[in-house]
Amino acid sequence: MKGCSLDLHLSPMASTLQSCHQDSTVNDRSSTIRSKEINAFYSGRLSEYDLVEIQMRAIIEMASKDREVTALELVPVRLESPLGCSVKRSVKRFLEKRKKRSKSFTLTPNYTSSTSSSSSSLHNF
């Protein structure tokens, strides 16, 4: 493939139709590389291009690599949630305080003797 340019000179077909057509007929005579029309929808615009097969393959390869990079960028990275850590810390603190309160809780002397007899009499009714 001597003399075959792999440079991707893309321009809309309407503006360079005549020059591309002349280039493709020269290529048809000198080698087996043929020019084909391709419609490209990219960034919300539809364009027509007159390309040789090698250029189309290069475009497809570049687009697939671009898509792979984009897909990798969109993969969510799961990190330890800061919310989960703070919730764990909060629960731990709550349980420690509750344990301290339960240990420090003592019954008063007035409450134990007088209420036990009155509460038992209430249950007899």
Swiss-Prot record:
Q: Where is the composition biased (Low complexity)?
A: 112-125
The UniProt entry annotates the motif EAR at 6-10
What triggers its expression? Up-regulated by mechanical wounding, and methyl jasmonate or coronatine treatments.
- Renumbered to this chain, region (Disordered) spans 99-125
- Signal sequence span per UniProt? none
**Entry keyword annotation includes Phosphoprotein:** yes
A single GO molecular-function term is: transcription corepressor activity
What is one GO biological process annotated to this record?
jasmonic acid mediated signaling pathway
Please provide the record's keywords in A-Z order.
Jasmonic acid signaling pathway, Phosphoprotein, Plant defense, Transcription, Transcription regulation
Post-translational modification, as annotated: Phosphorylated at multiple serine residues.
Q: What does this protein do?
A: Non-TIFY functional repressor of jasmonate (JA)-mediated growth and defense responses. Intrinsically resistant to JA-induced turnover, probably due to the absence of the canonical degron that strongly interacts with COI1 in the presence of JA-Ile in the TIFY/JAZ proteins.
**What is known about its subunit structure?**
Monomer. Lack of homodimerization, and very weak or no interaction with AFPH2/NINJA and other JAZ proteins. Interacts (via EAR motif) with TPL. Interacts (via jas motif) with MYC2.
Free-text domain note: The jas motif (82-103) lacks the canonical degron LPIARR that strongly interacts with COI1 in the presence of JA-Ile in other TIFY/JAZ proteins. Contains 1 EAR motif required for the interaction with TPL.
Which protein is depicted?
Protein JAZ13
Q: Which organism is this entry from?
A: Arabidopsis thaliana
Source organism phylogeny: Eukaryota, Viridiplantae, Streptophyta, Embryophyta, Tracheophyta
Q: Which gene encodes it?
A: JAZ13
